């Protein structure tokens, strides 16, 4: 049983409504506060619900979080990540573990739908040396979230300035900053991340929590992740190796791509209960990543 908590507005969130209707024991309400005496797990969608999420954490209430998927989201956003007690899936399961815990053949069928390639034929791209460093700063929404959670207290400008100076300690490569475009711009040819990685001949991408880090690795570009990130398993978290950045081997990239594909779902999978079942089977009852405050 879960309680789906929607925003206070006329419109009903279709994902929360779908989860609510997937089990007769589930509940649905529109609220910006919670009854802390009720410990039933809650479900929310989107980073704008951070004030509510903080209430969950402060009162030891488990929560499930819905947001854009890790892959297969262009041109249409058909897949959504579904995580427990975090904003992204931060752990990893290898192929043998997935095969033991769930239907691996079904995962492979889903992988083909998402990636448009058979898992057994999927060969990750290998990196080539580039001549620029691409910084993906936290968006305004993310910075507000981090501030509410007391993880940070800096502005985007301060972050960019600090990271630029840190990068300069280790390389003289050209530095490019990519501000997060709106969805229309991200889906337009020439504006998406893949196009910019090629156009700017990127040597390494530096991100905080952006899923762009995982997208870059799948395209054959090394990434460094400085915060909680679904790509942490495939990336280093320090800037000192940026001149010769780490790049995971093919097996790690393939298996992590399969795992993340198993942690994102379409609307039908939320409706029939598959999404909730998979989260419980594959995400190991995680606790919130209460990382040390970042001071710039």
Where are these regions (language model features)?
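Extended catalytic core of nucleotide-activated donor transferases of GT-like folds
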Residues: 24-79
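Generic beta-sheet signal
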Residues: 45, 65-68, 178, 208, ...
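Structural motif
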Residues: 40-41, 132, 203-204
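N-terminal pre-catalytic "stem/leader" segment of glycosyltransferase-like enzymes
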Residues: 1-47, 141-142, 284-296
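Conserved catalytic-core segment of nucleotide-activated headgroup transferases in glycan assembly
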Residues: 127-184
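Leloir-type glycosyltransferase catalytic cores
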Residues: 79-130, 234-296
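Short, solvent-exposed loop/turn segments at secondary-structure junctions
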Residues: 8-11, 48-50, 69-72, 138-142, ...
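Donor nucleotide-activated moiety binding/catalytic core segment of transferases
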Residues: 31-36, 165-223
């Amino acid at each position: 049983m879960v309680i789906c908590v929607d925003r206070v507005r006329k419109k009903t969130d279709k994902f929360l409504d779908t989860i609510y209707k997937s089990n007769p024991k589930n509940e649905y309400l529109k609220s910006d506060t919670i009854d802390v005496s009720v410990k039933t797990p809650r479900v929310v969608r989107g980073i704008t619900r951070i004030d509510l999420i903080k209430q969950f954490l402060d009162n030891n209430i488990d929560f499930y979080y819905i947001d854009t998927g890790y892959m297969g989201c262009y041109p249409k956003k058909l897949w959504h990540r579904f995580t427990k007690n975090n904003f992204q899936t931060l752990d990893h399961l290898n192929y043998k573990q997935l095969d033991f815990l769930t239907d691996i053949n079904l995962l492979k069928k889903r992988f083909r739908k998402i990636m448009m390639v058979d898992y057994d034929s999927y060969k990750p791209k290998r990196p080539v040396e580039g001549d620029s460093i691409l910084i993906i700063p936290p968006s305004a929404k993310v910075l507000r979230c981090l501030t509410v959670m007391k993880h940070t207290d800096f502005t985007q400008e301060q972050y960019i300035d600090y990271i630029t100076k840190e990068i300069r300690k280790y390389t003289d490569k050209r530095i490019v900053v990519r501000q997060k475009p709106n969805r229309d711009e991200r889906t337009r040819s020439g504006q998406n991340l893949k196009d910019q990685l090629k156009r700017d001949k990127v040597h390494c991408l530096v991100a905080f929590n952006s899923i762009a880090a995982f997208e870059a690795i799948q395209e054959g570009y090394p990434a460094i992740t400085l915060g909680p990130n679904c790509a942490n398993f495939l990336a280093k978290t320090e800037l000192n190796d940026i001149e010769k950045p780490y790049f995971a081997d093919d097996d790690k990239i393939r298996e992590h791509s399969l795992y993340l594909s198993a942690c994102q779902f379409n609307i039908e999978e939320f409706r029939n209960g598959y999404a909730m079942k998979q989260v419980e089977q594959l995400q190991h009852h995680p606790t919130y990543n209460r990382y040390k405050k970042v001071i710039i």
